[in-house]
Amino acid sequence: STIQTSDQNEKQDIASATAKELNVAKKLSTLFKTFKWKDKVAEKGDKARTHTGIVAQEVQLAFKEEGLDASNYGLFTSDTWTNDDGKEQTRLGVRYPELFSFIFSSIEARLTALDAK
């Protein structure tokens, strides 16, 4: 397994999630879906496996709906390259460990609010 550096001495601007970020995280927790990769369906047909995950475009929209830019967060990725035909291509993605941490922050905030009642 990979160890993620988490040393306070290597971080700055350490803060709790804002209300808008917590709203995004709550929304993201509802967006997980099952799907099949198109290239695997083309290769394997009905034998292509089903996966569980989130759609990066929906992640991007959830941030936008709260007035935030997903590209400012490490959980969201956007890679652009030029294909063999000279056309620019973009692929969006997520870093699941960061996504799960982000979502966990909203769960913890909701539990804390419930405990306070």
Give, region by region, the residue ranges found by the protein language model.
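Intramolecular chaperone/auto-protease modules of tailspike-like proteins
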Residues: Q4-K117
